[in-house]
Amino acid sequence: MSNILHRVGTLDEVASKAFRVRKTCNKMLLKRGFNIDEEDIDMTTEAFISRFGEKPSRETLTILAENKEDVSDRIFVFFPEEDKVGVKTIKMFTSRMQQENVKKAILVVKINLTPAMKSVIREMSTSDGNSFRLEYFKDSELLVDITEHTLVPEHIVLTPQEKKTLLGRYRLKQNQLPKIQLSDPVARYFGLIQKQVVKIIRVSETAGRYVTYRICV
């Protein structure tokens, strides 16, 4: 036990960041409705070192999860090793996705992607006949779980049926709903796509509990 504590005390900054980022990724997938082992959500630094080592390779941090409601809906989380991710790396990931019949992936990169690489990912995600959906986050965006911040209200993504029921109940057209941008940090956290609706629950000392809805644009 003392050896473990000693190693934790000397855990370098890179490994510490990897621990925090991977833990946030698991929490994010859980809140998106994917099955995540409880041990991954509650993982301690000691458990992380035991599983991945003191200087983990980013490749070993890869996550593969399936949706609680639809086991065919699976998602990868990849952690590229290189600082500047290129087309070769993206193609390596999409090749693995094809082999394992996985349509969604999140890339967790060390630094921001170049505009050219962002364009490549957009094209790969929207090309005719290509059903991949690729998202990306920087390490620095996942050091903490933004949904756990006291100023961020609870967000719940509505199913298509729940959205239909909402619009029918209030006799609304979807363009009459308040909007949330695709680029909004919380929208990105939940992996929202255009026209999805999110329910936002706020708690106020003066107004009590109140609910609003926003549509992703």
State what each model feature region is.
Residues M1-K103, P115, S119-S131, S140-D145, ...:
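Helix-rich terminal scaffold detector
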Residues P153-L158, E162, L166, T206-R209:
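Long beta-strand-rich cores associated with HINT superfamily self-processing modules
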Residues K173-D184:
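Short, structured beta-strand/loop micro-motifs enriched in basic residues and often containing a Trp
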Residues R202-V203:
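Short, surface-exposed secondary-structure boundary micro-motifs
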Residues G208-V217:
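Short, compositionally biased
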